[in-house]
């Protein structure tokens, strides 16, 4: 009796993880629709009406932490059967490397940074908790891969996209950080790297990263995360592009918003 109940609960969790992935896609569609009407309220687009704010460095550490802590917990757990498989370990490590950088390195490289509205920080914490659980739980308990999955073209191409996307993202962040010299204030036009082709090179890199992860994982959960990332960051990129065009008369008109030569 107890065994049957336990098996039913496990199957219920598997169905729930699939449902959460579809929910993430639905929320992504809602975010995409909302971004057509409303500015995204943090950074340079933050509304003055948001009075309660969190220092930028602290906000980044706190909001990204769940997506680092939850996978680490799964690695440490003795009840994570799928992490005995190399493909699962590598995929979860890909997720961890990104959030390790985002939580423990990126915030401490920031130069200044506007305080983040508490509401935006809270929503980011909620998302990172939701997605950190979804990805880590699926990979540690439910994702089944053949031992030779790491030689499958889908995994190899996906891993290559993930790595290239992360490098683009980190390099683009480096360019943005170094726009201002000590004592400088105000904004400048980013130049170099993929910024020669798009306004939001850092976002392009992150979207590429998670599309690669989705391909390598070949899962609904990975695809849902990549889709949500595109929905959220594409709206943010459009706001950036519009802002630069309004702010700088000399802004390069040939630059696309997010995807080189296309969009």
Swiss-Prot record:
pH-linked activity: Optimally active at alkaline pHs.
Q: Report the membrane topology from the UniProt record.
A: Multi-pass membrane protein
Q: What does the record give under GO molecular function?
A: 3-oxo-5-alpha-steroid 4-dehydrogenase (NADP+) activity; 3-oxo-5-alpha-steroid 4-dehydrogenase activity
Q: Which residues cross the membrane?
A: 16-33, 90-110, 115-135, 155-175, 213-233
Keyword NADP appears in the UniProt entry: yes
What's its EC?
1.3.1.22
Q: Which family does it belong to?
A: Belongs to the steroid 5-alpha reductase family.
Can you say what this protein is called?
3-oxo-5-alpha-steroid 4-dehydrogenase 1
């Amino acid at each position: 009796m107890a065994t049957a109940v336990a098996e039913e609960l496990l199957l219920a969790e598997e169905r729930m993880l699939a449902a959460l992935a579809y929910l993430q896609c639905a929320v992504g569609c809602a975010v995409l629709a909302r971004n057509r009407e409303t500015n995204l309220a943090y950074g340079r687009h933050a509304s003055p009406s948001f009075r309660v704010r969190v220092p930028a460095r602290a906000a980044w550490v706190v909001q990204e932490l769940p997506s680092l802590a939850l996978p680490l917990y799964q690695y440490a757990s003795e009840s994570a059967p799928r992490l005995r498989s190399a493909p699962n370990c590598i995929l979860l490590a890909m997720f961890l490397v990104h959030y390790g950088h985002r939580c423990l390195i990126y915030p401490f490289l920031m130069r200044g940074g506007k305080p983040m509205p508490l509401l935006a920080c809270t929503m980011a914490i909620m998302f990172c908790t939701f997605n950190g659980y979804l990805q880590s739980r699926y990979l540690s308990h439910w994702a089944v891969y053949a031992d030779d999955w790491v030689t499958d073209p889908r995994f190899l191409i996906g891993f290559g996209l993930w790595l290239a996307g992360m490098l683009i993202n980190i390099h683009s962040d480096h360019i943005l950080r170094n726009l201002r010299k000590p004592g400088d204030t105000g904004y400048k036009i980013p130049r170099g790297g993929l910024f020669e082709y798009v306004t939001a090179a850092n976002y392009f890199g992150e979207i590429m990263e998670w599309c690669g992860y989705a391909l390598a994982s070949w899962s609904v959960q990975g695809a849902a995360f990549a889709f949500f990332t595109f929905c959220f960051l594409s709206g943010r990129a459009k706001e950036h592009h519009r802002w630069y065009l309004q702010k700088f008369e000399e802004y390069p008109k040939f630059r696309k918003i997010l995807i080189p030569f296309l969009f």
